[in-house]
Amino acid sequence: MNSSSRIPAAGPLSYRQAGVDIEAADHFARSLRALAARTHGPDVVPTGDAYGALFRPPLAGLDSPLLAATCDGVGTKLLVARACGDYRGLGQDLVAMNVNDLLPRGARPLFFLDYIAVGRLADLEARDGRPGALSDVAQGMVAACAQVGCALIGGETAEMPDLYRPGDFDLAGFAVGLVDAARVPAGDVAAGDVVLGLAANGVHANGFSLIRRVLSDAGIEYGQPLPGMQSPIGAMLLQPTALYVAPVLALMSQVRVKAAAHATGGGILGRARGVVPDGLRVELDRSAFARP
């Protein structure tokens, strides 16, 4: 058998036959661009539909400007959202996990980009009068970016039915911020320094692999309330991650913050180890804050 006999005689294949709906992807991209335009100020340079967003950083008054960059996702909180059928908080989660990571450098968020990977876009479209999952995510991203003064300037939506199961999708985000070198916390922590903490409004978007395992082992469903609580555990877990940009930057403008940590993976103790020098320890007064 020669090689030519193995070539199929059928006509050319299309993207749609391969499981990728280019028209649906273009429609979603256009709708997201229209939403994202609400977050654009004069620093965003119009480029139409061209790839490669342009941004004019506000450098006035900065002696030694530095850019800070972060990349993060929302982890397996996606699985809780899917189980509960509630995706409304995930967009804010995605933005918050990134812009909050800029704060330990004292950086103000400038712009944000998203990456959305899906099995099939059709599985995530609006149904029965309810917005689709990705529409909820997009609305949340735009609202969160607007709240912190961060422009949503681009992103990517990839439809990969061979990689993701029907109804599955994943989220990642990228944020860039700006800070004057003189305002970056120097890390010169010393004995006697005061530790300040900002209260969380929930578990944010970390630790969900452990949380899901604990609930599964205990036989607790997401629709059940925990003892002494009225809200279902699912609703509590899906509380959107708090945006700390305004209070943290306001504090940093008034006092010199020596070090800061975003208490995500590893929690308070794990993150504190990264900013406290060897030979020192952090002492926390548990009576000073309410434990959940």
Residue ranges of model-derived segments:
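A generic structural signal for residues located within well-ordered alpha-helices
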Residues: 20, 24, 90, 206, ...
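Predominant activation on well-ordered alpha-helical scaffold segments within soluble catalytic domains
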Residues: 26-33, 51-55, 65, 96, ...
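Glycine-rich phosphate/pyrophosphate-binding loop regions near the starts of catalytic domains
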Residues: 34-201
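Short, acidic (Asp/Glu-rich) active-site segment that either coordinates a divalent metal cofactor
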Residues: 71, 183-233, 269
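Short loop/turn motifs at secondary-structure junctions
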Residues: 106-108, 210, 256
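Short gly/pro/ser/thr-enriched loop/turn and capping motifs at secondary-structure boundaries
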Residues: 160, 181-182, 204-205, 267-269, ...
